[in-house]
Every structure is written in structure tokens, then in C-alpha cells.
Curated annotation (Swiss-Prot):
Residues 180-250 are annotated as: Small ATPAse domain (RuvB-S). It catalyses: ATP + H2O = ADP + phosphate + H(+). Homohexamer. Forms an RuvA(8)-RuvB(12)-Holliday junction (HJ) complex. HJ DNA is sandwiched between 2 RuvA tetramers; dsDNA enters through RuvA and exits via RuvB. An RuvB hexamer assembles on each DNA strand where it exits the tetramer. Each RuvB hexamer is contacted by two RuvA subunits (via domain III) on 2 adjacent RuvB subunits; this complex drives branch migration. In the full resolvosome a probable DNA-RuvA(4)-RuvB(12)-RuvC(2) complex forms which resolves the HJ. Belongs to the RuvB family. This is Holliday junction branch migration complex subunit RuvB. Its EC number is 3.6.4.-. Residues 1-179 are annotated as: Large ATPase domain (RuvB-L). The gene is ruvB.
Length: 334
């Protein structure tokens, strides 16, 4: 079945317009949502500021959206900062003293905060107080300032890099996991309505199963399919058009992209399936180690294509099968 796309004249607020505003609009993550809903409603019922929250998991799964939802739920403001920009106490002072009572202070990539800034945050989290130094030299003096009670929400893709003193100061900790194809179809259905795109379930499923379990990527692919249909297919969209559009991005039916395929090919063709060190793989595909570990390896492991061992990464029989390679020599199959 073929559908028409209504061309939007303004799409500058694409990501913001698709962001869910309430937990009921947030698809997937059922257990996390249930816990967070209880946590927030209990605080509101007691007329208290909710405790500090930490969300962790791979990028693009909705950690920032949860911070927005929290602010909407309790009816307060949202102040956003990024960990790499918070290196020293002076980077935090203006943000902390500017908070209003009940505000959500969201720090993305909180694991990348500077150590000095992190330690400066401790009394702010525990007692809602900070010390500032006035003047300099022998006449310098420290003054303690009271802060308005606030909720710190941290987001990280690397929870293991958080120090224990910081991690234990969060009252609520939740992992955001990869989404099922069914959840992604629900997300895409909502997004297509907001973007005035008519697409059936078959088309949305074609996009969802190539989105690596990630809503952000799913929405980006939906926008790409819309653009492709607009420019190449007379604004008509169906599953065949979606398949052609996604093939142009070199994304296969499992959601693997060019880098994923290159990683598996290097492991199989040059290192007999492994084990191979991540530094070696990074040099072979022209990416840095951190990018591979954060953006590519988790999905390959999730799909059962790669195993992590003490000696390095190993391509599994599924990887051989997906790349149409013969696993006989490596795995002893007949």
C-alpha cells in the first residue's frame, strides 16, 4: 500500500516536537517508567522536591527525554548542562545559584565532569549549600551560600566511570535499555503523526528493525525516508520505498551499517574471527577506541555477532552467517 507524505514547511524543531512530554507518551521501558512514576508522584504528594536521579545506558535511548518529562510532571523548570563543560567549581557556581526551588538540573555525560567540579557538587546535592571564595590572596575568605532545593538528574553512557561518592548520592538509578522493534513501531507511529507522514505498520517495521533498538536513530531514519520519498518517489511512501531509502544509507536488514560490517569483516577475514584487541580494530576501521566501544560494540554484542573475551573480541557463528562467510575453519563445522 502506498501513502502520500505531506511536506512540512518547517521542521526546525524536529527533535523537540517528537520528544514525549509525559510518561504515558514515553514508549517502552515499562519497569523503569513504573518506578519513576511512583518516585515522582510520591514526592509530589508529600510536597517535596524529588531526590536526585541517574539514568544510564547507550546513547539515544531517551535519558534526556526523561529529564524533560520529570520537569513537566512536577511543573518546574529544566536547566541543562553538559559534563565536559563542567571542569572546575566556577563552571558550576552560576548554574547552581541560578536554580529556582524544585528545578531539574540535568547534566548530560555526567561521567565527563572534572574531578574538582564533581567534588564541589557533593554539598550541593546533600545539603543544598555551596562555598564560594571572595577576593584572593591573604585576604581571601569563604562564604557558604544556601541553594534552592533542586533535583539533579545525571545521564551517562558509562555508569562504571562514575566515582562511588557521586553514584551513591543518587536516590533513584535507572538503566535505559535498547527498545524492541514493537516499541520502536509505536514510537514511529507517534512521530509520523506529528510529522504528517502517512505510513502503514509494515513500512514502520521496516524502519524499526534497522534502527538498532534506538528511538533517536529510528526518528532520524523516518525523516530520511520522508526526504527520500519526497525527492525520488513523488512523495509516496511504502515498505519498498523505505527499503530503498535505507539501502542508500548502507544499512542492512539487521540494522548494521558500514562500520559494523567493516568491523566484522576485519575480524573474520584478517584475524580468523579473533580474538582481536579493540585498538587493532580501531586502527583497521579508522575509528577511535571509545567510539567503537560506545557506538558499535554494544549493538553487535546484543545481536550475538561479537563476544568479548579476556583476550579480545571474537566474531560468532552468527557473524559468519550474516556476512555469508564459511565458518568451517574457525568453528569446526561440517
Amino acid at each position: 500500500m502506498t501513502h502520500k507524505i505531506s511536506v512540512l514547511h518547517q521542521d526546525k524543531k524536529f527533535d523537540f516536537s517528537l520528544r514525549p512530554k509525559k510518561l504515558t507518551e514515553f514508549c517502552g521501558q515499562k519497569q523503569l517508567k513504573e518506578r519513576l512514576d511512583l518516585f515522582l508522584r510520591a514526592a509530589v504528594q508529600r510536597n517535596e522536591v524529588p531526590g536526585h536521579c541517574l539514568f544510564y545506558g547507550p546513547p539515544g535511548l531517551g535519558k534526556t527525554s526523561l529529564a524533560h518529562i520529570m520537569a513537566n510532571t512536577i511543573g518546574k523548570g529544566l536547566v541543562i548542562a553538559s559534563g565536559p563543560q563542567l571542569l572546575k567549581p566556577s563552571d558550576l557556581i552560576g548554574l547552581l545559584t541560578g536554580l529556582q526551588e524544585g528545578d531539574i538540573f540535568f547534566i548530560d555525560e555526567i561521567h565527563r565532569m572534572g574531578k574538582a567540579a564533581e567534588e564541589y557538587l557533593y554539598p550541593a546535592m546533600e545539603d543544598f549549600k555551596v562555598d564560594i571564595t571572595l577576593d584572593s590572596g591573604p585576604g581571601a575568605r569563604s562564604v557558604r551560600l544556601d541553594l534552592a532545593p533542586f533535583t539533579l538528574v545525571g545521564a551517562t553512557t558509562r555508569a562504571g566511570m562514575l566515582s562511588e561518592p557521586l553514584r551513591t548520592r543518587f536516590a533513584f538509578t535507572g538503566r535505559v535499555d535498547y527498545y524492541t522493534d514493537e516499541d520502536l513501531v509505536s514510537i514511529l507511529s507517534r512521530s509520523s503523526q506529528l510529522l504528517a507522514i502517512e505510513a502503514n505498520q509494515e513500512t514502520l517495521l521496516e524502519i524499526a528493525r534497522r534502527a538498532r533498538g534506538t528511538p533517536r536513530l529510528a526518528n532520524n531514519l523516518l525523516r530520511w525516508v520522508r526526504d527520500f520519498a519526497q525527492m525520488r518517489e513523488g512523495n509516496c511512501i511504502n515498505s519498498a520505498v523505505a527499503e530503498k531509502a535505507l539501502a542508500m544509507l548502507l544499512i542492512d536488514n539487521l540494522g548494521l551499517n558500514e562500520i559494523d560490517i567493516k568491523l566484522l569483516s576485519v575480524m573474520i577475514d584478517f584475524y580468523q574471527g579473533g580474538p582481536v584487541g579493540m585498538k587493532t580494530l580501531a586502527m583497521a576501521v579508522g575509528e577511535d577506541v571509545r567510539t567503537l566501544e560506545d557506538m558499535y560494540e554494544p549493538f553487535l554484542i546484543l545481536k550475538g555477532l561479537v563476544q568479548r573475551t579476556a583476550r579480545g573480541r571474537v566474531a560468532t557463528p552468527l557473524a559468519y552467517e550474516h556476512l555469508n562467510r564459511n565458518p568451517k575453519d574457525r568453528w569446526g563445522e561440517e
